[in-house]
Structures are given as C-alpha cells and as structure tokens.
Amino acid sequence: MGKNWLTCVSVACLSPGKDKKNQKPEKPKRKWSFGKQKSRESFDFPLEETPPVDPSPSSVHRPYPPPPPLPDFAPQPLLPPPSPPPPPPAYTINTRIYGESKESKNRQALALASAVAAEAAVVAAHAAAEVIRLTTPSTPQIEESKEETAAIKIQNAYRCYTARRTLRALRGMARLKSLLQGKYVKRQMNAMLSSMQTLTRLQTQIQERRNRLSAENKTRHRLIQQKGHQKENHQNLVTAGNFDSSNKSKEQIVARSVNRKEASVRRERALAYAYSHQQTWRNSSKLPHQTLMDTNTTDWGWSWLERWMASRPWDAESIDDQVSVKSSLKRENSIKSSPARSKTQKSASQSSIQWPVNNDTKSRKIEVTNRRHSIGGGSSENAKDDESVGSSSSRRNSLDNTQTVKSKVSVETTSNVSNAQTVKPKANVGAKRNLDNTKTLKSKSSVGTTGNLANTEAVKSKVNVGTTSMPKKEVVADKKKPPQMVLPKKRLSSSTSLGKTKKLSDSDKATTGVANGEKKRRNGGSS
C-alpha cells in the first residue's frame, strides 16, 4: 500500500498535465514537452525495478495498530490522506534516442528524497496526534472544550467591539478630512492662525517690556544704593572733619569757618547780656506786673521794648519831624486841589499863628517824657547799653511803629479837612442849623473822638472866634509823642476824655452865644 501511494505522489509531482497530452505534435512546444516527457517516463521505469530507490513499507513505516473510532466531539485530522490518482498509461520509450544526463538523475534523486521526508513528517504528526488523543482521559477533554468555547466567544465579542471602534474612528477621520477640505473651514483656520500670530507677537512684546522694566528697576535700585553709600561715606567724612565737598577755595572755606565761629560767639554774648538784664529788671524796686496793673501811670501796659524806645527821645523827635513834614506836604497838596479847602487852610494857619501856645500841653508832655525816662532807666548810660543790646528785630519793630503813626496822622489830617468842608456851608445857612450842629457836636464830644475836634475847629474859624488853634496845637503836641505810644493812647482815651469834653463845652457855649447875637441882629434889622 505504501508503495502504491508513493508512486502516485511521484507521478503527480513529475507527470505532465492532461492538456499537454492532448496537444498536437505539430507544434514545436509539444515536441519539446514530449521529449521531456519521454525522458521522464523512461526514467520512471528503471526506478521501480531498482531496489534501493523503491522504499518498502517495512523500512519507512512501522506497523501501528488500527486507530479506534473517533468520538463525535473529537477534532478531525488536519491533513486527510490524498486519494490515489489513476495509474498513468504505459509508454514505450526509446532510451537510445534521448540520452540521460547525470544532472537530471541527481535532481530526480533529490526530489524523491524530499518527498520521502515530507511523507515521513506527515506520518509522524498523525502518529503524535493519535498518541495524545489516546493517552489523555475523556472527562477533562469535555471541560477543556467548554473553556475553549467560552474563550472563543469572548474573543469573538472583543474582536467585534474593536472592529466597530476602529470603524467609528475611521468614519470620524473621514468626516474631519471632508470638513478640513471645505472653504469655510479654511477661512476660519486662516483667521485663527492670524489671530494666534498676533497673540504670540503681543505676548513676546509684553514679555520683552517686562524684562526691560525689571532690568531698569534693578539698575535704578543699584544706583540708589550706591548714592546712599556715597552719602553715608560723605557724611562720615564731614562729621570726622577730614573732607569738604564744596567747590570753594581754601581761603573761602577758612573765612566761612571763621565767620561761623564769630557768629556763635556773638550769639552767646547776646544771650548772656539778655539774661543779665532780665535779672536786673526782676531785681528792680518796682516789679513789671505792678507797673502794668497801675492805672494811674501813663505807661500802663508797656512792654520792655516800648520802655527801651521811650528811653531814646532823640530818635522819636527825628521821627516826629519827618511825620510833621509829610503831613504839611499832604496838606499843601490838598489845598491846591480845591479853592474852598485853600481858604479854610489859610484862615486856620492865621489863627494858629495868632493863637498862643498853651502851657498845659507842654507841662503834660514833659511829665510823660520824665516818666518814660524813669521807667526805661532815666540815664544816658542805660540808653547806651540799650543801643548796644538793640538787635535788628527791635529796629524793625520801631520802623513798623513809625509807619503806623504816619498812616494815622495822614488819616487824621484828611478827616479834618473833609469835616471842615462839610461844616462850612452848613454855618452859612442860619442860626438854627448852627445850633443843631453844636448839639450833635456836644453828643459826639462825650465819646472823645477826633472828628468832634475837627468840627468844632471848622465852626470856630467860620465865626472868627480865636479858638481854632487850640485843638490843632494839641494834635501837633500829640504828634511829637514817641511812636511807641500807640497802644497806651487807646487805653488813655477814657481818662483824658473828660478834660477834652470840658474844653469842647466851653467852645460850644461861645459859638452858641455868637450865633444868638447874629440872630438878634438879623431880627432887629428886619424889624
């Protein structure tokens, strides 16, 4: 049996096809194939006769028992035995025409050896499968089959799931490609790319600016620290006295240091002198608070500066002369401005020249100056000391006081002139109006103002009564007082108002008498 099966395999491998057999011998191809077929067929017959090439079943296959019948669930063999082909017809080949070559023999031998080896491998595989099937028991085969079927089902389900997922992914990719290929998507993508470019450009600019600002801040802080260290070093050198950073020369620096030393010495001397004078004032017989609280004295409420200025009458007289000159110039200007004013001023000047100076004002002025000299020191030595002590601040205060006095004198002169002009037409009207004016002047004179004095002076000049020079002389006497008496004047107004009102009342009586006499004359003339 094995011999017949091997011959069938060799014939199937080496024999030509049926179409080659049915071909006509006229064509050259058929001649070529026919020659090959003859050579092959001529080579087959002696192989069957030679014993080494023809394999016997005893040498190749071992005798095995027939296999038992397979159950229904057993797997079928992988390679079923091929059906033996029909035996080829016998051909008589003339071996003499076609010579056999050694190469063809070697090829045939190799082909037969390979075929035998393949057959042996197939038989060995079948035998191994049969041995395994026979040796394994029947029960575990059933359990393994269930597990295998379950694994197969699981694998099939998982493969289906993966296939569906891959299909879904492929469909999504196809849709995405179709969308990307559209015009709207292209425009959108271009716009997005341009905006992304601008955003990246802005971000880079902002980052560069931040880096630049941080670097500038670092350099600024470094410079500030360096300047601070330089200032500290400079201050240390200056405090130690080893360095002077000014751009001045050596002589200028030395002169500045000398001036500073002299100024410090002067300051110390002034402080020491002021302290010593404070002690002398405190140790005086009359305490300063007693003089301030004493209302009988004319220097009530003076400060030490006013007392010091009162002890310098020569300065006060020079200031009063300047004030009188300025007031006279202002009066001349006012006289030139209006003819009515010029007439009143001429009459007032004539009356003032004819009227003698009152001795009471002179005595009062002498008493006031004596008192001031007694309070301020009363001697020329104290005055000299005060001159040495007087600083720039005291001189400035004295100048300010003189300016205030000048302004007050100018205001008084202008008010006197204006009041004189207003009273003049009123005196020409009649006696009744003169009486009314005198009544108003009496009521105002109780207050002790300067306006009443001016009104009475104007009325007296109109009636040709020689009483107009007295108040003007009093004003001139008041002008000659020192400029530091501005504050005491306000406080002394209440004490001196009584004397002034008495004088005003006498002058008013005279004016009223003159007015009554004129009225009687008019009445007599009319009758």
From Swiss-Prot:
Bias (Basic and acidic residues) ranges: 17-26, 361-370, 471-481
Which species expresses this protein natively?
Arabidopsis thaliana (Mouse-ear cress)
The major lineage groups are: Eukaryota, Viridiplantae, Streptophyta, Embryophyta, Tracheophyta
Please indicate which superkingdom the organism of origin belongs to: Eukaryota
Quaternary data = Binds to multiple calmodulin (CaM) in the presence of Ca(2+) and CaM-like proteins.
Any one GO MF term held by the record is: calmodulin binding
The family note in this entry says: Belongs to the IQD family.
| Predominant place of localization | nucleus
Domain IQ, by residue range, is 147-175
Which portions of the chain have biased composition (kind: Polar residues)?
335-360, 399-422, 437-455
Where are the residues of the annotated region Disordered?
A: 13-90, 323-527
Write out the entry's keywords from A to Z: Calmodulin-binding, Coiled coil, Nucleus
Keyword field contains Metal-binding? no
- What is this protein's function? May be involved in cooperative interactions with calmodulins or calmodulin-like proteins. Recruits calmodulin proteins to microtubules, thus being a potential scaffold in cellular signaling and trafficking. May associate with nucleic acids and regulate gene expression at the transcriptional or post-transcriptional level.
Query: Is Transferase a UniProt keyword of this protein?
Result: no
State the span of motif (Nuclear localization signal): 478-485
Tell me the compartments it is located in.
Answer: Nucleus; Nucleus, Nucleolus
State the protein's name.
Protein IQ-DOMAIN 4
Which segments show compositional bias classed as Pro residues?
Answer: 63-90
Chain positions covered by the region annotation Calmodulin-binding = 256-273
Q: Name one GO cellular component term.
A: nucleus
